[in-house]
Amino acid sequence: MELRVALCQVHAEKDPGKNLLRLEDIVRRTDADLFVFPELYLSSYGGSLPKGFLDTAIPEMQGLCSERGCAVCVGAPVEDDGLRNSQFFITADDVHRYDKLHLARFGIYAENQYTAGTSLTMFQWKGMTFGMEVCYDIMFPEIHRAYALAGADVVISSAASAGPSRQFMERIGPARSLENTVYTVFLNNIGPCGDDKFWGGSCIYGPLGDMKAVADDGECVIVSVISTEEIARAREIRHHLEDLRRDIDWKV
């Protein structure tokens, strides 16, 4: 099984309507199965959505997915027992939502207004099993490992990562993929962030930690192929999940 994944590294404006229109334009003119957009893309990082925006935007995106035979993964703030930093995986028939578990409250990041999520989100689509996480979550290996042990093939890691975090993000992504023999689809914001800027660098890491596709520090849409066959080959080479000592409690 193969899927064409579009890394949609585009700047989010403070106008949610414009962001949605741009998303729709990209989906209509790009040949891909899955379109991944950054953390909080619909509102922009630090922005907000008009009341009821998602009530119409999500069905609109579902209609687009039906028209194009694709899925869209996109970030947006959601009011649900507090404000959530959420990532949606939208298909013609289903809507899956993940709420960011680990909120960034340091440096230039201002996420004190959000309420942290409490659970993981995993689902199947077109013959592959997906999990989601958001930005700072990737620093916590338990998330990738939990998804992998539950049978995930791909972990989508949307982000709004600015300059100071780049050195850490570029180290951790390949490690998460390799130690769990899964694809990691990392999709970062681009453009200004206060006195700094989002650095882009969106990429796909293969199940052996190798980079399959990478964006530069500007706006772009890059399409790359992921496959279950490559995951199977990787797990024949590296037996990390098979050899994991699940009989040990791992508490000191």
Model-derived segments and their meaning:
Residues 11-15, 49-53, 108-112, 131-135, ...:
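Short, flexible loop segments at the rims of nucleotide/cofactor-binding pockets, characterized by
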Residues 2-14, 97-99, 129-137, 156:
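Active-site-proximal beta-strand elements of phosphoester/diester hydrolases
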Residues 122, 189-252:
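C-terminal beta-strand edge segments of enzyme domains
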Residues 56-73, 139-220:
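CN hydrolase (nitrilase-like) catalytic-core segments centered on the catalytic cysteine
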Residues 13-16, 24-91, 96-97, 163-182:
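Cys-nucleophile CN-hydrolase/nitrilase-fold catalytic domain and related Cys-dependent amidase chemistry
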Residues 79-150, 165-171, 233-240:
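Active-site catalytic loop in hydrolytic enzyme cores
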Residues 17-27, 139-145:
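Short, acidic/polar
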